[in-house]
Amino acid sequence: MPGKAHSHALRSGRFSAPGQIYMVTTRLSSGGRTFANWRLGRLVVNELRLVHEQDIAHSLAWVVMPDHLHWLFELRLGTLDRVLQRVKSRSAIAINRATGDTGRVWQTGYQDIAVRHDESLKNFARYIVAKPLRAGLVRTVRDYPLWDCKWL
């Protein structure tokens, strides 16, 4: 598969630090639109809220799009890989239970940006929250049910 041969090189430079803020994007494995079913998207939301409540990662903004997740958060405990593994595996189990499927839900890996302290978190949050608008899914952000932002 193209791109797989050097995927370890992307991970080798990844740095996890408690207190660091990350913007992460992760996609569905099938390329499908599983989260167009908002009930299934809520299962991902439940996991984001759980890691927040357990002080593992403090969510600043997120949006569950039909085929991917954007998440801005502060890492509190563990590593970036472990937090993403937890959210993805627990949500995949819940989604497979809800649908009766047994297959893979998420792609392996994710894209991440370590946000510098001098960058505007609100600009990252605006970018995330406006994704459904830019994708033409809704006319106003209020019409899309699968997002949240600390500042709104």
Residue ranges, per PLM feature:
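Short catalytic/metal-binding and nucleic-acid-binding patches
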Residues: 1-152
